[in-house]
């Protein structure tokens, strides 16, 4: 078997070090980090923007008059598509 050169060993060590660095970086909690801003929930953000949720109505369609499609429309789908 061939032996590894020092350059190859250095590259492997560098890859292993970078992989462990990035895996620990993903698992780190940044809650107490000074650059992370405090958590703002959506209601307080909307209040700061002077948008009042109570003034907006929620429209929900709860009527039972919905119809399901009856299938292909013969006016539009009466003919079969042309064959090539």
UniProtKB/Swiss-Prot annotation:
Which source organism?
Medicago truncatula (Barrel medic)
Q: Glycosylated at which positions? A: 72
An example Gene Ontology biological process: cell differentiation
Miscellaneous: Overexpression of CL13 in roots almost abolishes nodule formation when inoculated with Sinorhizobium species. Roots of plants silencing CLE12 and CLE13 exhibit increased number of nodules after infection with Sinorhizobium meliloti.
Please provide the record's keywords in A-Z order: Developmental protein, Differentiation, Glycoprotein, Hydroxylation, Secreted, Signal
Protein family per UniProt: Belongs to the CLV3/ESR signal peptide family.
For the modification Hydroxyproline, the affected residues are 69, 72
Report what the protein is called.
Answer: CLAVATA3/ESR (CLE)-related protein 13
Give the UniProt entry's GO cellular component terms: extracellular region
Q: Where is this region: Disordered?
A: 57-84
Q: Where is the signal peptide?
A: 1-29
The gene it comes from is: CLE13
Matches recorded under InterPro entries: CLAVATA3-CLE
């Amino acid at each position: 078997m061939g032996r590894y050169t020092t350059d190859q060993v250095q590259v492997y060590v560098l890859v292993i070090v970078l992989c462990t660095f990035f895996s620990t970086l993903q698992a780190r909690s940044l809650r107490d980090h000074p650059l992370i801003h405090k958590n703002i929930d959506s209601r307080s953000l909307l209040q700061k923007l002077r948008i009042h949720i109570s003034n907006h109505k929620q429209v929900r369609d709860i009527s039972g008059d919905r119809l399901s499609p009856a299938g292909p429309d013969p006016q539009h789908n009466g003919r079969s598509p042309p064959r090539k």
